[in-house]
């Protein structure tokens, strides 16, 4: 994970920008990859350790450029710029509601009037023109004198990548109003632990949790959009589930001796369990989720994995069912992106449900964001983590947590749990948090694997 740039004057920041740009250019040149261009997608560079120089250079460029802009603008103009950022989301709400992007050809141009005619619904040429011209000012679409508009490499993704488009829709149309409603939610309910009292419910005028709303008959569209959005933000990026599989956790050690049963708690359709089963066929896997979700997972599970991966309906707020295990076989309870959906009140309840039946040979692995202390990572990474924390607050009254916040939960349940280590995948933003019963010592070889772990209670890369 890239370090924070501490330069604080014009020439130092410019030097950082030039140095990082040279490193990125050299890396791409050596790999025979295209250089960054406004007219093409970003270079396709896999998220792995070998490509760390590229991602470090890219992060340094972004941070230096943003710091330069803040420095040159000065405090007053920086505040004024922030005050107008919501206007971009307002324009995108119009773009997504009326699907402007779908009415612009991927090759060639069209006119504002033709877009308005195709949309109908009382949308005027003037509204289309004003909205698209505003979007073009921050890099979405290209406008041509005479009333014409074309796609660029950025806006075309709204047509060619429906999962990414779903994430953008979710952010603009659902999360944006929910965020604006946070003060009203606090005024109405106080600082609440309940998902039914989050900004989302206030924004739609109902006391209802977002997931409950999505499961209502007329919430199906938003539910489907949410599922696509989760795929969109995870595909190949810092939140890709493969960081959990290949990101430094020593899954191979679980195959030793009598082996382990890996229980994927809230595992959705089982994509993580199936990826692990492909790589470690001697392990057994059980995917737990809502009845309708595990039905889909079981149906779509490849035939050759069905003897390794089973699907069981289970409410993760309740204690684990009895598991059939062989003599000496351990159980790993794996929970990815679960606790952040919930306030501490309910996150503690989820962990308590896992702790109740935990044996000395068992462990819990949480795949969650671990928010670093201030100044420990680059500003872009730090901001993205806090952005996600606010998303959890506005939508569900959930939260992203620091290491100390996780440890407070582990200490509050009965029996008490012990944080063994936190492994941070090289290019991922979700850590692997390993927990056992208090007093249990992991084998020495399990600590500090492949340079990813900094030992017990160490947040790696932070």
From Swiss-Prot:
<comment type="similarity">
    <text>Belongs to the class I-like SAM-binding methyltransferase superfamily. Cation-independent O-methyltransferase family. COMT subfamily.</text>
</comment>
<dbReference type="InterPro" id="IPR029063">
    <property type="entry name" value="SAM-dependent_MTases_sf"/>
</dbReference>
<keyword id="KW-0489">Methyltransferase</keyword>
<dbReference type="InterPro" id="IPR036388">
    <property type="entry name" value="WH-like_DNA-bd_sf"/>
</dbReference>
<feature type="binding site">
    <location>
        <position position="289"/>
    </location>
    <ligand>
        <name>S-adenosyl-L-methionine</name>
    </ligand>
</feature>
<comment type="pathway">
    <text>Mycotoxin biosynthesis.</text>
</comment>
<dbReference type="InterPro" id="IPR001077">
    <property type="entry name" value="O_MeTrfase_dom"/>
</dbReference>
<dbReference type="InterPro" id="IPR016461">
    <property type="entry name" value="COMT-like"/>
</dbReference>
<keyword id="KW-0949">S-adenosyl-L-methionine</keyword>
<keyword id="KW-0808">Transferase</keyword>
<comment type="function">
    <text>O-methyltransferase; part of the gene cluster that mediates the biosynthesis of cercosporin, a light-activated, non-host-selective toxin. The perylenequinone chromophore of cercosporin absorbs light energy to attain an electronically-activated triplet state and produces active oxygen species such as the hydroxyl radical, superoxide, hydrogen peroxide or singlet oxygen upon reaction with oxygen molecules. These reactive oxygen species cause damage to various cellular components including lipids, proteins and nucleic acids.</text>
</comment>
<protein>
    <recommendedName>
        <fullName>O-methyltransferase CTB2</fullName>
        <ecNumber>2.1.1.-</ecNumber>
    </recommendedName>
</protein>
<dbReference type="GO" id="GO:0008171">
    <property type="term" value="F:O-methyltransferase activity"/>
</dbReference>
<dbReference type="GO" id="GO:0044550">
    <property type="term" value="P:secondary metabolite biosynthetic process"/>
</dbReference>
<dbReference type="InterPro" id="IPR036390">
    <property type="entry name" value="WH_DNA-bd_sf"/>
</dbReference>
<feature type="active site" description="Proton acceptor">
    <location>
        <position position="340"/>
    </location>
</feature>
<dbReference type="Pfam" id="PF00891">
    <property type="entry name" value="Methyltransf_2"/>
</dbReference>
<dbReference type="GO" id="GO:0032259">
    <property type="term" value="P:methylation"/>
</dbReference>
């Amino acid at each position: 994970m890239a370090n924070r740039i501490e330069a604080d004057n014009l020439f130092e920041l410019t030097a950082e920008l030039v140095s990082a740009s040279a490193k990125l250019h050299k890396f791409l040149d050596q790999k025979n990859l295209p250089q960054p261009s406004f007219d093409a997608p970003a270079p396709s560079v896999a998220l792995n350790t070998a490509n760390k120089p590229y991602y470090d250079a890219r992060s340094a460029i972004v941070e230096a450029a943003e710091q330069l802009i803040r420095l040159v603008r000065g405090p007053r103009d920086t505040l004024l710029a922030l005050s107008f950022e919501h206007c971009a989301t307002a324009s995108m709400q119009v773009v997504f509601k009326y699907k402007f992007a779908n009415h612009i050809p991927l090759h060639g141009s069209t006119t504002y009037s033709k877009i308005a005619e195709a949309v109908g619904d009382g949308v005027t040429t003037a509204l289309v023109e004003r909205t698209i011209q505003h979007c073009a000012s921050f890099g979405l679409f290209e406008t041509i004198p005479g009333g014409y508009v074309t796609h660029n490499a950025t806006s075309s993704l709204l047509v060619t990548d429906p999962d990414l488009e779903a994430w953008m829709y979710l952010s603009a149309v659902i999360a944006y109003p929910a965020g604006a409603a946070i003060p009203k939610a606090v005024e109405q309910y106080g600082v609440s632990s309940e998902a039914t009292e989050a900004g989302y419910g206030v924004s739609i005028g109902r006391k209802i949790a977002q997931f409950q709303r999505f499961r209502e008959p007329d919430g199906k569209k938003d539910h489907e959009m949410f599922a696509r959005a989760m795929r969109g933000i995870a595909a190949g990026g810092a939140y890709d589930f493969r960081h959990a599989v290949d990101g430094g956790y020593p899954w191979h050690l679980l195959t030793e001796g009598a082996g382990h049963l890996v229980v994927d708690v809230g595992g959705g359709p089982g994509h993580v369990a199936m990826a692990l089963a492909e790589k470690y066929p001697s392990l057994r896997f059980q995917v737990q989720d809502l009845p309708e979700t595990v039905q889909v997972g079981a149906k779509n599970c490849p035939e050759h994995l069905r003897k390794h991966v089973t699907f069981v309906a289970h409410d993760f707020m309740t204690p684990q069912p009895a598991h059939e295990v062989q003599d000496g076989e351990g159980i790993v309870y794996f929970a990815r992106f679960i606790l952040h959906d919930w306030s501490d009140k309910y996150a503690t309840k989820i962990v308590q449900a896992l702790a109740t039946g935990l044996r000395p040979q068992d462990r819990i692995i949480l795949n969650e964001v671990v928010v670093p202390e201030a100044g420990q990572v680059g500003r872009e990474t730090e901001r993205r983590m806090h952005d996600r924390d606010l998303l959890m607050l506005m939508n569900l009254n959930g939260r992203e947590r620091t290491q100390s916040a996780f440890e407070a939960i582990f200490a509050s349940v009965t029996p008490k749990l012990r944080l063994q280590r936190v492994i941070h995948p090289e290019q991922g933003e979700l850590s692997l948090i390993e927990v056992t019963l208090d007093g249990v010592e992991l084998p020495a070889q399990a600590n500090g694997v492949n340079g990813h772990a900094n030992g017990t209670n160490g947040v790696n890369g932070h």
